[in-house]
Regions:
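Cytosolic covalent-transfer regions centered on His/Cys nucleophiles
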Residues: 1-158
């Protein structure tokens, strides 16, 4: 089972409009399904926000993908897992140290308690990140069925 199927099976997904949402609120919203599934604690998002405030928007990658996470074995990480969130509007994370604007509308929020599982998850995510048609389909997703359909239509190499 691929990472997208695992996200849907765990219920770790959400879809937002994103209008007027700050990056801090987007990070919080991206953790809500993970809280509900017992993957992270309610205040886990605060640690992610603290890391981004300290180090800048290092969690935002090409193709408007954000991968919010904290340091390994952070307090509040109850299980190793991934959450998915799609936003109809771009979420502004500000500028990086080079003055480049960082925005995201596809979020993969990470939680880690097991380094081997965590590395496997990151490896699978990197395959997803390099699959432009899949990322485009995920950005447009509005339901768990859309996530699964995108995974089926644009499979990644294992």
């Amino acid at each position: 089972m691929g990472v997208l199927e695992k996200i849907v099976e765990a219920g770790n997904y959400s879809f937002i409009d994103g209008e007027g949402v700050t990056w801090q609120e987007a990070v919080r919203l991206s953790t809500l399904p993970m809280i509900k599934s017992g993957t992270v604690s309610e205040d886990y998002y605060k640690q992610i926000v603290d890391c981004i405030e300290k180090y800048g928007p290092y969690v935002v990658f090409e193709h408007n993908i954000a991968m919010p996470h904290t340091q390994e074995n952070a307090t509040g990480a109850l299980k190793t897992g991934i959450g998915f969130m799609a936003s109809k509007k771009m979420i502004d994370f500000g500028e990086d140290e080079d003055g480049e604007k960082k925005e995201a509308n596809v979020f993969f929020t990470l939680s880690s308690t097991n380094p081997n599982e965590h590395l496997d998850n990151i490896q699978q995510l990197m395959n997803i990140f390099m699959n432009d048609p899949l990322i485009d389909a995920l950005a447009a997703a509005e339901s768990p069925e859309d996530i699964l359909e995108a995974a089926k239509k644009y499979p990644c190499e294992e």
